[in-house]
């Protein structure tokens, strides 16, 4: 429900009824901030898809580098933090809600124009867009109404793989308070087909009903 209700993300692999279900990367991001607070610099590297039945272990906040693993020591997320820290739950909630709302609009509003530009598209029968990494740089840690806005997006195509980087700004009111970037991997790329893409978007939008 996090993906749908908070992120407005209707990716089929985030549907609990899907056989391919995995925990949304944005949920791992939110849980990490909830556990460790906001730091001036934060880098998140995702190293695996988390199945529904996995119990994750969040280590105590003793080090600048924290690795979130399951009970069998398989790593799923590495968080590296620098600078001052703010554990205020309100500031964390404000930033999480703004960021995941931005993130949830990646498809179709950002990714489809990129794919069309490069004349490639994800497999419409098994669409797969994966979180690779994300970084945040905050100029201040006291946040009231942060808003995450896209600056620009680019895509590098390597065979059937597409590497996408979303650059974004973080504003609080009329003040710039930070910036960051999100990296995604698009798998199983094929030649762009406008009709197939239109159908994929329709199916995605239908999940919102």
Predicted regions mapped to residue ranges:
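Long, helix-rich, hydrophobic modules that act as membrane-proximal anchors or helical bundle/coiled-coil regulators
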Residues: 150-152
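HotDog/MaoC-like acyl-thioester-processing domains
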Residues: 1-2, 50-52, 60-147, 156-209
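Hydrophobic, proline/glycine-rich low-complexity stretches
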Residues: 1-54, 99-124
């Amino acid at each position: 429900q996090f993906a749908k209700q908070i992120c407005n993300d209707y990716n089929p692999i985030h549907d609990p009824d899907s056989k391919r279900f995995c925990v949304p990367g944005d949920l791992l991001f939110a849980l990490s901030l909830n556990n460790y607070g906001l730091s001036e610099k934060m880098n998140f590297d995702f190293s695996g898809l988390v199945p529904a039945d996995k119990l994750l272990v969040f280590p105590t906040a003793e080090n600048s580098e924290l690795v979130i693993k399951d009970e069998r020591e398989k790593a799923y997320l590495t968080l590296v933090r620098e600078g001052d820290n703010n554990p205020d739950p309100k500031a964390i909630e404000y930033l999480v809600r703004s960021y995941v709302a931005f993130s949830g609009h990646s498809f179709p509003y950002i990714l489809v124009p990129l794919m069309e530009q490069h004349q490639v598209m994800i497999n419409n029968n098994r669409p797969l867009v994966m979180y690779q990494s994300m970084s945040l740089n905050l100029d201040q840690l006291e946040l009231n109404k942060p808003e995450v806005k896209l600056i620009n997006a680019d895509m590098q195509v390597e065979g059937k793989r597409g590497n996408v980087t979303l650059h974004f700004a973080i504003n609080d009111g009329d003040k710039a308070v930070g910036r960051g970037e999100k990296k995604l991997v698009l798998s199983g790329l094929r030649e762009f087909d406008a009709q197939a893409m239109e159908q994929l978007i329709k199916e995605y939008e239908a999940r919102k009903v």
